[in-house]
């Protein structure tokens, strides 16, 4: 019930009246760029992204300069391999670096902000990136329904003065 309410509120926020336009959106939980074969493979992830030809991508579970991924900034690798522009938000410090979410976009954002989100099991974040014709939000929501509900007014407040179409994508758990 609470999850349905959360999703309903997000639906209303995302589909406010707007001018018709097409934006190809991909949401991809990349699991630290580790495949089912337990190997880090940034090219494999980049190929999946490129094959879908998105305008914008919400990425979850990105390592940035951690021991686990041998000091590589995963989003930076994906930027190089896809030719897209990256925006990163650390959610938690992790193994000498950080772990978080990101956006890959064809356009460079005009501006962006990072909003902390509730997360009992680990801290969560929301990236709000403004582009010429729209605003894009990327997130990786908490596993707990209570935290998901607590996130709704934070998202609503952060977007209350936006006068462009708003799109939101991510791992909503």
Regions found by a protein language model. Name each.
Residues 5-13:
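Sec-dependent signal peptide hydrophobic core
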Residues 150-173:
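Metal-dependent phosphoesterases centered on the DNase I-like endonuclease/exonuclease/phosphatase
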Residues 37-38, 62-134:
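Structured beta-strand-rich core segments of catalytic domains in phosphoester-bond hydrolases
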Residues 58-60, 87-90, 167-171:
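Active-site neighborhood of phospho(di)ester-bond hydrolases with catalytic His/Asp-centered motifs
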Residues 137-155:
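Active-site-proximal segments of metal-dependent phosphoesterases and phosphodiesterases across multiple
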Residues 2-6, 18-81, 93-97:
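N-terminal, active-site-proximal structural segment of metallo-dependent hydrolase catalytic domains
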Residues 31, 63, 142, 172-173:
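Catalytic metal-binding/acid-base residues of hydrolase active sites
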């Amino acid at each position: 019930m609470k999850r349905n309410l959360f999703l309903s509120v997000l639906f209303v926020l995302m589909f406010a009246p707007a001018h018709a336009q097409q934006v190809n959106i991909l949401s991809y939980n990349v699991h630290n760029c580790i495949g089912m074969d337990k190997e880090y493979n940034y090219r494999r992830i980049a190929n999946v992204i490129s094959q879908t030809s998105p305008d914008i991508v919400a990425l979850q579970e990105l390592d940035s300069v951690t021991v686990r991924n041998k000091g590589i900034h995963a989003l930076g690798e994906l930027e190089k391999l896809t030719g897209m522009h990256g925006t990163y938000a650390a959610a938690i410090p992790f193994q000498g670096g950080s772990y978080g979410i990101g956006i890959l976009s064809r356009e460079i954002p005009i501006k962006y902000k990072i909003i902390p989100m509730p997360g009992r099991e680990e801290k969560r974040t929301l990236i709000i990136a403004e582009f010429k014709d729209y605003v894009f939000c990327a997130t990786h929501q908490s596993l707990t329904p209570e935290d998901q509900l607590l996130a709704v007014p934070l998202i609503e407040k952060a977007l209350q003065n936006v006068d462009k179409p708003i799109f939101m994508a991510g791992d909503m758990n």
